[in-house]
C-alpha cells in the first residue's frame, strides 16, 4: 500500500454506438470505480488508496482503448462497415423506387446514410491527426540522435535550429488542436443527431405498422435492420463497459497481466525497474509488535519492511492498514518481496513490476519513476 496519497484522473473512449457507426465518448470505467467507492464507503469494502489505483488503471485502459480504436485495422474495418451501410441503403432506395410508403422512410434512410458518411469523415480526420502527432513525437528523437552524431555542428547554429523547430512544432500543435476541436464538435453533433434520428425512425416505422410491411417491404425491413443494429451495438458497448469496469474493480491483477502480455513496452524498462528499492516484509509477534509500536509511534503495527541487497538495510514499520497491496488487495505475508517506488508507495513486486512495464508511473499517485532515475543519473554525472 502506501505512505502518502495523491491522485488525478481522465476519460474513456468507446468507439461504438449506433450501429457501429458513431464514436461515443464515455467515462464508464472510471465512473464504475467511483460508484463502487461511494457504495462501499459506509461498509469499508475497499479503502480509498485501492480505489485510486483502480481509477488509474481505468485511465490506462482508456488510453489503450483509444489507441486500439484508431489503429489502422480498426479504422479500415469501421470505414468498410459504414461504407457497406451506405451501399446497401443506396441499392435498396434504387430497387424500391416503385414503393410508396405512408411514412417518409426514404428520407430517414437518406439521413442515416449521410450520418454514416459524416462518421467516416470524422474517423479519417482523427486517424490522420493521431498519425501526424505520432510522427511529430518521433521526429525530435531522430533529429536529436542525428545531431549528436554530427560533431561539426556549431553550438549557436544548433540553438537556432532548435528554436525554429520549437516554433514550428508549436504552430503545428495549435493547428492540430483547432482541427481536433472541430472534429470533436462535428462528431458530437453527429452523435446527438443520430440519437434524435433513431427516435424519429422508430416512431415512423411503428406508426406505419403492417401497412408499411405489406406495401413497402424493402424500405420497411431496411429501416428495421438499421434500427436493430443501432440497438445491438449500444447495448453491446454499455455491457462491455460494465464488464470491464467490474473487472478493473475486482480483478485488477488479471487486467494488468493481460495488458502486460499484449501491449508493447511503453513504460519503464527492466533495468529501470530493477533499480527501484526492493524490500522483504516480515510480520511481527505480539511482543515485538508492542516494541515496534512504541519506537515508531504507531497505534497498530502490521509488520516491518526490510531493505534487500544492502549491508545496512533500512527498515520501515507499516501500520496494519498499510500492510496490504492495493493492486491485488492481498495482505502482505511473511517473506513477501515488496517494491518501494521513489514516491514512497509500495506494492507486491509481481503486481507493480508488470504495471511499470506498461506505464512508468506510480499506480497510486502517478509519480513518474523515470524522472527520478534520470535526475539521479544527472547528479552522478
UniProtKB/Swiss-Prot annotation:
Q: What class of enzyme is it?
A: transferase
Q: Which residues form the signal peptide?
A: none
- Gene Ontology cellular-component annotations: membrane
Name the pathway it acts in: Protein modification; protein ubiquitination
Which Pfam families does this one have? zf-RING_2
Q: Where in the cell does this protein reside?
A: Membrane
Q: What is this enzyme's catalytic activity, as reactions?
A: S-ubiquitinyl-[E2 ubiquitin-conjugating enzyme]-L-cysteine + [acceptor protein]-L-lysine = [E2 ubiquitin-conjugating enzyme]-L-cysteine + N(6)-ubiquitinyl-[acceptor protein]-L-lysine
Q: Disordered: where is this region?
A: 1-23, 135-161
Q: Does the keyword Coiled coil apply?
A: yes
Query: Molecular function (GO) terms listed?
Result: transferase activity; zinc ion binding
Keywords (A to Z) from UniProt: Coiled coil, Membrane, Metal-binding, Transferase, Transmembrane, Transmembrane helix, Ubl conjugation pathway, Zinc, Zinc-finger
Comment, domains: The RING-type zinc finger domain mediates binding to an E2 ubiquitin-conjugating enzyme.
Q: What is this protein called?
A: E3 ubiquitin-protein ligase At1g63170
Amino acid at each position: 500500500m502506501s505512505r502518502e496519497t495523491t491522485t488525478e484522473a481522465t476519460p474513456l473512449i468507446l468507439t461504438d454506438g449506433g450501429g457501429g457507426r458513431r464514436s461515443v465518448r464515455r467515462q464508464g470505467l472510471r465512473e464504475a470505480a467511483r460508484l463502487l467507492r461511494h457504495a462501499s464507503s459506509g461498509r469499508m469494502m475497499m479503502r480509498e488508496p485501492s480505489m485510486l489505483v483502480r481509477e488509474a488503471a481505468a485511465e490506462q485502459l482508456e488510453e489503450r482503448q483509444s489507441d486500439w480504436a484508431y489503429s489502422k485495422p480498426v479504422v479500415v474495418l469501421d470505414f468498410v462497415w459504414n461504407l457497406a451501410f451506405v451501399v446497401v441503403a443506396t441499392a435498396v432506395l434504387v430497387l424500391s423506387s416503385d414503393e410508396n410508403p405512408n411514412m417518409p422512410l426514404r428520407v430517414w434512410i437518406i439521413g442515416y446514410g449521410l450520418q454514416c458518411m459524416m462518421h467516416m469523415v470524422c474517423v479519417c480526420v482523427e486517424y490522420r491527426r493521431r498519425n501526424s502527432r505520432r510522427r511529430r513525437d518521433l521526429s525530435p528523437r531522430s533529429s536529436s540522435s542525428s545531431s549528436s552524431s554530427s560533431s561539426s555542428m556549431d553550438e549557436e547554429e544548433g540553438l537556432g535550429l532548435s528554436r525554429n523547430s520549437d516554433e514550428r512544432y508549436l504552430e503545428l500543435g495549435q493547428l492540430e488542436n483547432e482541427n481536433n476541436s472541430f472534429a470533436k464538435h462535428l462528431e458530437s453533433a453527429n452523435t446527438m443527431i443520430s440519437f434524435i434520428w433513431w427516435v424519429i425512425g422508430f416512431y415512423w416505422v411503428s406508426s406505419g405498422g403492417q401497412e408499411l410491411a405489406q406495401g413497402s417491404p424493402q424500405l420497411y425491413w431496411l429501416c428495421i435492420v438499421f434500427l436493430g443494429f443501432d440497438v445491438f451495438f449500444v447495448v453491446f458497448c454499455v455491457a462491455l463497459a460494465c464488464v470491464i469496469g467490474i473487472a478493473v474493480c475486482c480483478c485488477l491483477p488479471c487486467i494488468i497481466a493481460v495488458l502486460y502480455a499484449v501491449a508493447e513496452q511503453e513504460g519503464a524498462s527492466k533495468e529501470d525497474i530493477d533499480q527501484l528499492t526492493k524490500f522483504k516484509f516480515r510480520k511481527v509477534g505480539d511482543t515485538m509488535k508492542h516494541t515496534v509500536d512504541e519506537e515508531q509511534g504507531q497505534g497498530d503495527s502490521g509488520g516491518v519492511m526490510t531493505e534487500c541487497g544492502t549491508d545496512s538495510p533500512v527498515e520501515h514499520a507499516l501500520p496494519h492498514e498499510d500492510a496490504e497491496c492495493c493492486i491485488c488487495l492481498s495482505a502482505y505475508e511473511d517473506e513477501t518481496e515488496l517494491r518501494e517506488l521513489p514516491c514512497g508507495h509500495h506494492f507486491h513486486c509481481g503486481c507493480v513490476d508488470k504495471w511499470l512495464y506498461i506505464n512508468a508511473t506510480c499506480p497510486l499517485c502517478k509519480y513518474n519513476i523515470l524522472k527520478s532515475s534520470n535526475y539521479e543519473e544527472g547528479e552522478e554525472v
